[in-house]
Design a protein with these regions (language model features):
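Short, charged helix-to-loop "capping" segments that act as catalytic/coupling loops
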Residues: 71-78, 109, 114
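Active-site neighborhood of divalent metal-dependent phosphoester/pyrophosphate hydrolases
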Residues: 11, 41-59, 76-90, 200-204, ...
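Short N-terminal secondary-structure initiator segments
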Residues: 1, 15-16, 76-103
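His/Asp/Glu-rich metal-coordinating catalytic cores
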Residues: 87-236
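N-terminal active-site segment of His-dependent metallophosphoesterases
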Residues: 1-69, 73-76
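Short secondary-structure boundary micro-motifs
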Residues: 27, 80-81, 118
Length: 236
């Protein structure tokens, strides 16, 4: 049996006006680490909005690295993290060459591919592609396949989008890409996962999304994505 801890929206470095919330965040992350150990979790997924700003404080960055190192158990438990709409994609991927030796994989750009190979902790990155990674752990006799869908705005995908029907083109592009990856790499002989940082609704839904707080960077509109349809999630 595979045990997964899924977490997201840490917003490290968040401030409430002039007050830092780093002390609260340390307590929450300590509890997450304890749960991962108590439940003997095999895999940790961190699904975006790791930081609260594009340029996080030194204290926030230090807290992230210390927490992920604990969660990875010195490279014996994989941690896979993607960027959200609050994160800088370049900043998130910056420590990847060092972090991967501890089994920590960052992914934030659709044009990047995680390098394959066996790490010191025993984890093997057996297959990878743009938006996809397959992991093999020594204790498991089946692979773990993860479709990686970090937040992406229309600017980052502008080469694929026309001026007209931009919203429809964006949805179609992502949905087709996810399905192609699922068809190519996923089958019943492994555990197939999708990890993304988007806003999904059912097509034709008449229920408007909840209003975002003024302090939130919008995930819908203002250069961000429109909502995606649940029908665009891949079938395996």
């Amino acid at each position: 049996m595979l045990k997964i801890l899924h977490t997201a929206d840490w917003h490290l470095g968040k401030r409430l006006q002039e007050y830092s919330r780093i002390a609260e965040q340390k307590l929450v992350l300590e509890e997450i680490c304890q749960i991962a150990d108590q439940e003997e979790v095999d895999l940790v997924l961190l699904a975006g909005d790791i930081f609260d700003t594009f340029n996080p404080s030194h204290e926030a960055v230090e807290l992230l690295y210390k927490t992920l190192r604990r969660l990875s158990k010195n490279g014996t438990r994989p941690v896979v993290a993607i960027s959200g709409n609050h994160d800088s994609s370049q900043f998130v991927e910056a420590p990847d060459p060092l972090a991967r030796e501890l089994g920590i994989l960052f992914y934030s750009r659709y044009d990047s591919i995680i390098s394959c190979g066996t790490l010191d902790g025993g984890m093997e990155i057996s297959q990878s592609d743009s938006g996809f990674v397959e992991l093999r752990l020594p204790k498991l006799d089946f692979p773990i396949r993860i479709l990686l869908a970090p937040y992406a705005n229309e600017v980052s995908l502008r080469t694929y989008l026309g001026e007209e029907n931009r919203e429809e083109a964006f949805r179609e592009l992502l949905g087709q890409n996810w399905q192609q990856l699922a068809d190519r790499y996923c089958d019943e002989n492994g555990v197939n996962l999708f990890m993304g940082h988007f806003f999904f609704v059912e097509e034709g839904s008449t229920t408007p999304p909840d209003a975002e707080p003024e302090s939130e960077r919008p995930i819908l509109h203002v250069g961000g994505t429109q909502s995606l349809f649940t029908q665009q999630l891949p079938n395996t």
